[in-house]
Amino acid sequence: MAKLIVSDVDVKDKKVLVRVDFNVPIKDGVIGDDNRIVAALPTIKYIIENGGKAILLSHLGRIKSDEDKKSLSLAPVAKRLGELLEKPVTFVPSNEGKEVEDAINNMKDGDVVVLENTRFQDIDNDFGKRESKNDPKLGEYWASLGDVFVNDAFGTAHRSHASNVGIATAMKAAGKPAAAGFLLEKEIKFLGNAVANPVHPFVTILGGAKVSDKIGVITNLIPKADHIIIGGGMAYTFLKAQGHNIGKSLVEDDKVEFAKELLEKAGDKLVLPIDNVAATEFNNDAASEVVGQDIPDNEMGLDIGPKTIELFKKTLEGAKTVVWNGPMGVFEMPNFAKGTLEVGRALADLPDATTIVGGGDSTAAAKQLGIAPKLTHISTGGGASLEYLEGKELPGIACVSDK
């Protein structure tokens, strides 16, 4: 069922509550990466350019004590948003009470207000984690502040919080619209369609350290994908399951039997490394060598080897849909980043393919290579992307009204 989108709703003269994902890295009041703020701009601009009042809610980090509040205020984010919008943005240093209500009542059409970090509600109250545990009264209170709710935070779509599910539930109960923003719409369109209705050949590239993080994804995609490429630390659990010696490589021994089952179920769909770059220690400057699928006892695999790079490139040839999540090696160490970077290049060079990238290291690789403009979509969600690829219904999407 298609979801209601912000562009389906009349926002003129309306107070529009928008759950954005402004969970950006901040150190000493300085924002390290403003990508998530930039990603929210199309929805915010649409609302204010069409005569609506934009009231923005977001979490930032995890609040465990009063001490955390100092470093996790959204004040620097509101300032940066004002610079990006090239207009004044009002920051309210609370998210409940008279100060909030007065600020909203004083808004004119086209104004933007940013409320304080929603997770400040996770301490100092009788309920406990009011935001993270979805206190219905908090959701109802926030819903009472607006006429329309827009969820544009894919990064928290796999969580049922007061600021997404709570507000949407209360809005719909009051007969008010709960819509998806343009960013959420994009994730549904590309990531959702890649899983539900991919154009074939459909190839998934999975990497990262742990098989356990990707078990649900592999299980869900075996019937759907034409090939599943496995790289990164998780590959060694599969190589061990095949009977190879993996030396000191990262392995999840409790997942070896499960890896055997997946190998049996997937047949030749699973594409594993055929050679590896190995070293005696986990260190960028460690002396390394290219070895086959068997790794010497005193060494550990830290990247895919040159033959594997060629194999993975060949597997990608002719693909029409590709989803990539996770690095092929220890990407943060330059000497073991080649596999990840080469796979990224191959992805960018695919003609007529829908290419979707998710996960921090894969996204960082795409940016480092300058290939982001050549990719169809870079997902803004970490855990949310994985759960979507697992075929799970995400609460933050389910709570949005259907068209």
UniProtKB/Swiss-Prot annotation:
Pathway assignment: Carbohydrate degradation; glycolysis; pyruvate from D-glyceraldehyde 3-phosphate: step 2/5
Reactions catalysed, as given in the entry: (2R)-3-phosphoglycerate + ATP = (2R)-3-phospho-glyceroyl phosphate + ADP
Its EC number(s): 2.7.2.3
GO-annotated cellular components: cytosol
Top-level taxon of the source organism: Bacteria
Xref: SUPFAM superfamilies: Phosphoglycerate kinase
Biological source species: Lactobacillus delbrueckii subsp. bulgaricus (strain ATCC 11842 / DSM 20081 / BCRC 10696 / JCM 1002 / NBRC 13953 / NCIMB 11778 / NCTC 12712 / WDCM 00102 / Lb 14)
Positions contributing to ATP binding: K214, G301, E332, G359, G360, D361, S362
Annotated binding of substrate, by residue: D21, F22, N23, R36, H59, L60, G61, R62, R119, R159
InterPro entries membership: Phosphoglycerate_kinase, Phosphoglycerate_kinase_CS, Phosphoglycerate_kinase_N, Phosphoglycerate_kinase_sf
Family recorded in the similarity comment: Belongs to the phosphoglycerate kinase family.
Lineage: Bacteria, Bacillati, Bacillota, Bacilli, Lactobacillales
UniProt GO BP: gluconeogenesis; glycolytic process
Protein name: Phosphoglycerate kinase
Molecular functions per Gene Ontology: ADP binding; ATP binding; phosphoglycerate kinase activity
